[in-house]
């Protein structure tokens, strides 16, 4: 089983968690990383998932295979590069970075490290895509 860590539990992080947790026998959220001041910490007793407040400690956990980043774009470069350096595969919500140069650096580093890097940009329910699917 591929064990993932979800970083960020704001509106989009909660949607990702709800959409993916427990839906596959091949992957699971083993850890959720929250800010120490997160109101979501009050929900911790309800979860079967480990909750931590330190990104670095999660990256040091050898049982975590990949990181799902649902964090503000301003931190993406640092968070993605740290995950790659720790040997974790990365799914990051758009945008990958704040500048083209940062994005190119991230892609080069992940490629050299042979780490899977994916950027989320899902529009399958947008009206134009729904119409295209209907016509195909």
Give the positions of each predicted feature.
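Short, Asp-centered acidic motifs that coordinate Mg2+ and/or phosphate
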Residues: 31, 66, 116
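General small-molecule cofactor/ligand-binding pocket signal
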Residues: 30, 50-52, 118
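Acidic-histidine catalytic/liganding microenvironments
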Residues: 23-24, 61-62, 126
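Alpha-helical structural signal in soluble globular domains
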Residues: 19-23, 43-46, 82-86, 105-109, ...
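A general structural signal for well-ordered alpha-helical segments in protein cores
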Residues: 13, 40, 76, 80, ...
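A contiguous active-site-proximal alpha/beta segment in oxidoreductase catalytic domains
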Residues: 97-136
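N-terminal Rossmann-like dinucleotide-binding module
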Residues: 1-46
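Beta-loop-alpha module in the N-terminal Rossmann-like domain of NAD(P)-dependent dehydrogenases
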Residues: 49-109
């Amino acid at each position: 089983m591929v064990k993932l860590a979800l970083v960020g539990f704001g509106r989009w992080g909660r949607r990702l968690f709800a959409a993916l947790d427990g839906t596959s026998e091949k992957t699971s959220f083993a850890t959720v990383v929250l800010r120490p001041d997160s109101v979501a910490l009050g929900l911790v007793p309800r979860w079967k998932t480990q909750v931590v407040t330190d990104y670095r400690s999660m990256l040091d956990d050898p049982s975590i295979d990949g990181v799902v980043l649902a964090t503000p774009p301003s931190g993406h470069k640092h968070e993605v590069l740290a995950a790659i350096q720790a040997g974790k595969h990365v799914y990051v919500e758009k945008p990958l970075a704040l500048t083209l140069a940062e994005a190119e650096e991230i892609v080069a580093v992940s490629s050299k490290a042979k780490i899977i890097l994916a950027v989320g940009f899902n529009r399958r329910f947008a009206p134009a895509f729904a119409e295209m699917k209907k016509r195909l």
